[in-house]
Amino acid sequence: MMSFGGADALLGAPFAPLHGGGSLHYALARKGGAGGTRSAAGSSSGFHSWTRTSVSSVSASPSRFRGAGAASSTDSLDTLSNGPEGCMVAVATSRSEKEQLQALNDRFAGYIDKVRQLEAHNRSLEGEAAALRQQQAGRSAMGELYEREVREMRGAVLRLGAARGQLRLEQEHLLEDIAHVRQRLDDEARQREEAEAAARALARFAQEAEAARVDLQKKAQALQEECGYLRRHHQEEVGELLGQIQGSGAAQAQMQAETRDALKCDVTSALREIRAQLEGHAVQSTLQSEEWFRVRLDRLSEAAKVNTDAMRSAQEEITEYRRQLQARTTELEALKSTKDSLERQRSELEDRHQADIASYQEAIQQLDAELRNTKWEMAAQLREYQDLLNVKMALDIEIAAYRKLLEGEECRIGFGPIPFSLPEGLPKIPSVSTHIKVKSEEKIKVVEKSEKETVIVEEQTEETQVTEEVTEEEEKEAKEEEGKEEEGGEEEEAEGGEEETKSPPAEEAASPEKEAKSPVKEEAKSPAEAKSPEKEEAKSPAEVKSPEKAKSPAKEEAKSPPEAKSPEKEEAKSPAEVKSPEKAKSPAKEEAKSPAEAKSPEKAKSPVKEEAKSPAEAKSPVKEEAKSPAEVKSPEKAKSPTKEEAKSPEKAKSPEKEEAKSPEKAKSPVKAEAKSPEKAKSPVKAEAKSPEKAKSPVKEEAKSPEKAKSPVKEEAKSPEKAKSPVKEEAKTPEKAKSPVKEEAKSPEKAKSPEKAKTLDVKSPEAKTPAKEEARSPADKFPEKAKSPVKEEVKSPEKAKSPLKEDAKAPEKEIPKKEEVKSPVKEEEKPQEVKVKEPPKKAEEEKAPATPKTEEKKDSKKEEAPKKEAPKPKVEEKKEPAVEKPKESKVEAKKEEAEDKKKVPTPEKEAPAKVEVKEDAKPKEKTEVAKKEPDDAKAKEPSKPAEKKEAAPEKKDTKEEKAKKPEEKPKTEAKAKEDDKTLSKEPSKPKAEKAEKSSSTDQKDSKPPEKATEDKAAKGK
């Protein structure tokens, strides 16, 4: 709750609400004295009521608030002369404002609590994820143990199978031996049978012989019996004869004796003959039978021998065949067994493989489901977080407005820490202040309208309609903004003069941190915002999901102007704001951007990066590194910001150019493509592409997916790139912590793009990463030119990814491009500014004539990059030598002084225009008719401003050489301070949030602070 200590003791001087239409714009004056408390410096404001550590940030903020409240202080001076009738109204407004601030602070505290709850929830989710990973690791370890045991068992099975095969072979050999023995047994049995058959034959022969012998014996016996009979008969006859002889006489006895002798001789001889015949027959028959049997036996034995030989040979063949058959069968069985084992192994492996595949697929499905769930949760949380951030930014804007008014009143009355003196240009102030208030009110209202209307436009319009409307609107818008920027320039000069008189030294000394941090945040945001158009066109899954978004890149471009344009305002407000009609659109537009981002679907993705990076990159690079991988993983960002950074030197510029789509922007695609090592392989191709891009963002979107492919390779090459841009952006506070450095940054960046462009034009394929490393750090930061060794030590990832440094240098070229895109076309390319400034000035003088002449100049300047392609080499040599001189304070101040003259207040006018363009397209067309006269005015003052710029650049180099040695110790001391602040930041999250919210104040107060420094430089 902001303390308005002396509310009842207000000065008697009259206070009336300024410009009755705006409730936020009022003037407060309070008594000076010991009793009066200072609302911004000493009080615990509601903005910081939620943190105890915010006292330091609040105490460091008077100069911020003073700078931010310049307009309100001048307005309050104007209202002092209105008379006493407005005093009571001022008291009432102060009380109502107290109540409003209390309500806002309560809401803000609620949002902060919600953010903390979400952070606690995120931490719990991270713990659960870690536990799940550990469980998975445990399961994988058990799986390895089981696999080891299974492998051992499989080895044992294989060994047993081999042993079984050997045993089978041995068994087969034994079976062969058994068969051989059996065969021998069969042979022996056969031989025995043959012998038995022979024995039987001989037995039969013996029987036959025995039978023959029996017959012969019988015959012999019969013959012997016959012989005995004959003998008896003969004896009987002889007895008879002898009896007769004896009986008959001697004669007769003699005669009988003679006859008997004769008979006896005949019988004996006959017997002898018979016996001889029988013996002969018997011998002959025996001999014949013996001979016959002998012949027959010989024949049979010969036949038996032949048969046995044949049988033996056949048996040998049979045995041989049997052996071969057995060998084959054993081999076949062994092969069958091996085949069976292999088939079993194969089936087991297949089963295992199928089981593994099924388990892996299940795991993949589970992980996919978890990933989708986590992505959805992350997206929801990011959206909630973005909503909170958007609300916070809106509150910051309101509170910053309050602070500006309060600080302005304090400074005006003389309660500020620095004495107050009226500037010379006060007579102009009253009209200016009323304009400012009207525009600030318009900003807030238009932001709210634009958020809703852009969403509706996205859903309803189609691609072709949107592209045509956006091109027409942007061309008209460019003309309107040119006119309004000139008016804003006068207002800003008046404010700057007033601010300079109040506190030139105090603002430089008291807010180095603010100024340093705000450019850091601006730079940090600028890459993210430069990326966002690319993401919206090519990568954001939101486009893939919603056909309306994919169909209407023009809408995305219409929405992304606040994002893509904010880097130009933030990084180099001084030159960029006047020169780029649509893109140098002031921190006010940046503030308005946050609510617009809340509802636009693309901004729901990119703003998370923009605003999450803006605090984190400025204050905690560790958080940024943590966030950048998250961005890489998040489905919305599909492909890491690193990719987008690496490829977006061109893309970040081309979407910006497309958004404007005026003839002036036909140049800038040429540059973007000439610079990109991926896109622009020749400036001719770049020129060929530029009309297509100027005509249709659809083509741009078609090209962006091609760009999206190459970054994937870049991501594969440098996984550290996702972190290195964050680190580089996070280290920017170390390299630019003083207002001097901040101011030096904008001009040096204006010139560093020259080097980056010449490098890219020379070598579209990034000839040597070493040179790019040496040059791009020098281009990006003044201190890098002095100590590249420190830079490489701090960011080894920078050395590893020269692509990123190239990507960063082009990001800083964005402000330069914006300058180029301006209707005046002061600096189409820095190299052209140096080499061909006289012809450009001639072209610029012709510029206000007609937009047709501007288009002709665009085509000429598109051809200019081709002619100047050899020249960049010469310029590159000159620029590294000139870069260190550029770092000095004098050059920074002079360039900013020039920029201030060129850049009045496009800041406040621009956002209203941008969002009106997005919301109400018919309104813009009506405004075109009104504001075309302003067009010429905006162009005319920018001519002298451009001529001035060439001369100071030459002076700056000499002055900066003299002041190099002085700057180096300062930069080193500030780098150390930055390291300390970074180390303290983790312990002070609340202070960081306070500083984040105060970044808007820093952005608003930047122009008046620069104006004071410009005057100091002129005084020197």
From Swiss-Prot:
Residues 511-1020 have a biased composition (Basic and acidic residues). The modification Phosphothreonine is found at T768. SMART domains: Filament. One of its GO terms (cellular component) is postsynaptic density. Residues 414-1020 are annotated as: Tail. Residues 267-288 are annotated as: Coil 2A. Keywords: Amyotrophic lateral sclerosis, Cell projection, Charcot-Marie-Tooth disease, Coiled coil, Cytoplasm, Cytoskeleton, Disease variant, Intermediate filament, Neurodegeneration, Neuropathy, Phosphoprotein, Repeat. Residues 459-475, 483-498 have a biased composition (Acidic residues). Residues 525-826 are annotated as: 30 X 6 AA repeats of K-S-P-[AEPV]-[EAK]-[AEVK]. Residues 146-244 are annotated as: Coil 1B. InterPro entries: DUF1388, IF_conserved, IF_rod_dom. The modification Phosphoserine is found at residues 76, 124, 347, 421, 511, 526, 532, 540, 546, 552, 560, 566, 574, 580, 586, 594, 600, 606, 614, 620, 628, 634, 640, 648, 654, 662, 668, 676, 682, 690, 696, 704, 718, 724, 738, 752, 763, 787, 795, 822, 888. Residues 101-132 are annotated as: Coil 1A. There are a number of repeats of the tripeptide K-S-P, NFH is phosphorylated on a number of the serines in this motif. It is thought that phosphorylation of NFH results in the formation of interfilament cross bridges that are important in the maintenance of axonal caliber. Phosphorylation seems to play a major role in the functioning of the larger neurofilament polypeptides (NF-M and NF-H), the levels of phosphorylation being altered developmentally and coincidentally with a change in the neurofilament function. Residues 289-292 are annotated as: Linker 2. Coiled coil: none annotated. Residues 58-83, 456-1020 are annotated as: Disordered. Signal peptide: none annotated. Forms heterodimers with NEFL; which can further hetero-oligomerize (in vitro). Forms heterodimers with INA (in vitro). It is linked to Amyotrophic lateral sclerosis: A neurodegenerative disorder affecting upper motor neurons in the brain and lower motor neurons in the brain stem and spinal cord, resulting in fatal paralysis. Sensory abnormalities are absent. The pathologic hallmarks of the disease include pallor of the corticospinal tract due to loss of motor neurons, presence of ubiquitin-positive inclusions within surviving motor neurons, and deposition of pathologic aggregates. The etiology of amyotrophic lateral sclerosis is likely to be multifactorial, involving both genetic and environmental factors. Charcot-Marie-Tooth disease, axonal, type 2CC: An axonal form of Charcot-Marie-Tooth disease, a disorder of the peripheral nervous system, characterized by progressive weakness and atrophy, initially of the peroneal muscles and later of the distal muscles of the arms. Charcot-Marie-Tooth disease is classified in two main groups on the basis of electrophysiologic properties and histopathology: primary peripheral demyelinating neuropathies (designated CMT1 when they are dominantly inherited) and primary peripheral axonal neuropathies (CMT2). Neurofilaments usually contain three intermediate filament proteins: NEFL, NEFM, and NEFH which are involved in the maintenance of neuronal caliber. NEFH has an important function in mature axons that is not subserved by the two smaller NF proteins. May additionally cooperate with the neuronal intermediate filament proteins PRPH and INA to form neuronal filamentous networks. Belongs to the intermediate filament family. PANTHER family: NEUROFILAMENT HEAVY POLYPEPTIDE, NEUROFILAMENT TRIPLET H PROTEIN. This is Neurofilament heavy polypeptide. The lineage of its organism: Eukaryota, Metazoa, Chordata, Craniata, Vertebrata.
